[in-house]
Curated annotation (Swiss-Prot):
It catalyses: (3Z)-6-oxohex-3-enoyl-CoA + NADP(+) + H2O = cis-3,4-dehydroadipyl-CoA + NADPH + 2 H(+). This is 3,4-dehydroadipyl-CoA semialdehyde dehydrogenase. Catalyzes the NADP-dependent oxidation of 3,4-dehydroadipyl-CoA semialdehyde to form cis-3,4-dehydroadipyl-CoA. The keyword Oxidoreductase applies. Optimum pH is 7.2. It comes from Aromatoleum evansii. GO terms for biological process: catabolic process. Residues 479-488 have a biased composition (Basic residues).
Length: 515
């Protein structure tokens, strides 16, 4: 079966044989995708004219009602999406929930936020500002929807959440969506869009999806559009310098490689709640989605005198995690999504091993449960130890997108700050400490290079949402998630639909009507 693309209000199969999407446990080919023959320029123009006009004619609360209907539909088909996640991504039930339920929760959050925005079609920002000695001439800022398309080039790890965490604020803002999911796991995103289209929830052109290669997509975006990319730093670099993107000053939001940190405070000794909470969170981040999360912990910073004990504690927990076919009882860690991702993980792991010792795992020949290692895409959870600190290179520059993390001991707070900053900006850091003096120096020292800093102490306990969870009510992002022309990048939060909106200043006479 070949998955069709939804463009110019029609379902169209791409030409040729296309690429196969496989089961990463068995290697079985499931479906095929192709974007060959799709007129991307026509698809984008149809979205701008038909989809954009229809969405902008609706009020915020009307758009919010459509998001609520989408969430209800996705919830009703949750079991079908879990099955696709299992077959195409090798997801355990917990992994599928993280993606699918996360998507549904996010859409619901934006639906609630949009309803609260009321019957307007654009937003006033702040009050009137005097521009003259008297109030006869004033200014007012507005947030206006872009007249173009929100183009999403998404990553393979979250085909559901990755689509809807971007699409929900765009649709709420009145901007049509053009989604290009990552090829290896495109099936789930395509099915969700197909279900929404079949239900007739959105007007024609409000959402489009193309599965397969991006081809000439960036040749046809304009200054009225916004492009959002999640993926590798290498691809991101090519996108930033694409001739059309540069020539037309296209807004582009990039979320690329990120070596996120978990940082243990000097007070978090073995036996303390903070130590135990750190162990639990590190293991969870290494195993949920098999470590295939942009926000996953890649570096573990711990006081030199405690680092070995922390490594032993994490290793002990990892030893109890069953790795194998998610269809088998008790399996906690599934495969990576493809053999290509497995090869990339092994390549990155080889670089890390040049300056690290292996504390746990790292065996390329380990035997997963109920799976053939020769055809499956498993990587054993691996904990490394690097005592080179700032002198190390790969540990701070290479993100192994899998169940791999590196323990890095630090000498004092200043050293911890320097090591965390050596990642050149990350999406998130989590800190496990109740030491006010330590936190007072560390958090301000790393905040400007992190999209989010989560502090966990004994009082917080297990009530926190998690190091790697992205909440629609809270910003995340950072220097590794940049927007051209907008400064430090971030992800939108519910109630903040500004990413697909454009700020405009409007000087006016004091007696002029407010739009």
């Amino acid at each position: 079966m070949k998955l069709a693309n939804y463009v110019y209000g029609q379902w169209i199969e791409g030409a040729g044989e296309g690429a196969a999407l496989t089961d990463p446990v068995t290697g079985e080919a499931l479906v095929r995708v192709s974007s060959d023959g799709i007129d991307v320029a026509r698809a984008l123009e149809f979205a701008r004219t038909a989809g954009g006009a229809a969405l902008k004619a609706l009020t915020y609360e009307e758009r919010a009602a459509k998001l609520a209907a989408i969430a209800e539909l996705l919830q009703a088909k949750r079991a079908e999406y879990f099955d696709i996640s299992l077959r195409n991504s090798g997801a355990t039930e917990g992994d599928a929930s993280f993606d699918v339920d996360g998507a549904i929760f996010t859409v619901k959050s934006y639906a609630r936020a949009g309803k609260a925005l009321g019957a307007g079609r654009h937003l006033k920002e702040g009050g009137r500002v005097a521009l003259a000695k008297t109030d006869v001439f004033q200014g007012q800022h507005f947030l206006m929807p872009l007249t173009g398309v929100a183009v999403f080039i998404n990553a393979f790890n979250f085909p559901a959440w990755g689509l809807w965490e971007k699409a929900a604020p765009a649709l709420l803002a009145g901007v049509p969506v053009f989604a290009k999911p990552a090829t290896p796991t495109a099936w789930l995103a395509q099915r969700m869009v197909a279900d929404v289209v079949e239900a007739g929830i959105l007007p024609p052109g409000a959402i489009s999806i193309v599965c397969g290669g991006a081809r000439d997509l960036l040749d046809h975006v304009t200054e009225c559009d916004v492009v959002s990319f999640t993926g590798s730093a290498d691809t991101a670099a090519r996108m930033r310098t694409h001739p059309n993107v540069v020539a037309r000053s296209v807004r582009i939001n990039i979320e690329a490689d990120s070596v996120n940190s978990a940082i243990l405070g000097p007070d978090a000794q073995p036996g303390t709640p903070e130590f135990d909470l750190a162990v639990k969170e590190i293991v969870r981040e290494m195993t949920v989605k098999t470590g295939q999360k942009c926000t996953a912990i890649r570096r573990i910073l711990a006081p030199a005198g405690v680092s070995r004990a922390l490594a032993d504690a994490v290793s002990g927990k990892l030893a109890g995690c069953k790795v194998g076919n998610p269809r088998s009882e008790g399996v906690r860690v599934g495969p990576l999504v493809s053999k290509a991702q497995q090869a990339a993980a092994f390549e990155g792991l080889a670089k890390l091993r040049q300056e690290c010792e292996v504390v746990f795992g790292g065996d390329p020949d380990f035997e997963p449960v109920d799976a053939d290692a020769a055809v499956s895409a498993f990587v054993q959870p691996t904990l490394l130890y690097c005592d080179k600190g700032l002198a190390a290179r790969h540990v701070h520059d290479v993100e192994v997108f899998g169940p791999v993390a590196t323990m890095v001991p630090y000498a004092d707070t200043r050293d911890a700050v320097a090591i965390a900053r050596r990642g050149h900006g990350s999406l998130v850091a989590s800190v496990y400490s109740g030491d006010a003096a330590f936190l007072g120096e560390l958090v301000p020292g790393i905040a400007d290079l992190h999209g989010r800093v989560m502090v966990v102490d004994a009082a917080v306990g297990a009530n926190h949402t998690g190091h790697g969870n992205v909440m629609p009510t809270c910003l995340h992002g950072g220097p590794r998630a940049r927007r051209r022309r907008r400064g430090v990048g971030r992800s939108a939060r519910a109630g903040d639909v500004s990413p697909p909106l454009r700020r405009a200043g409007r000087p006016r006479g004091a007696g002029s009507p407010v739009a």
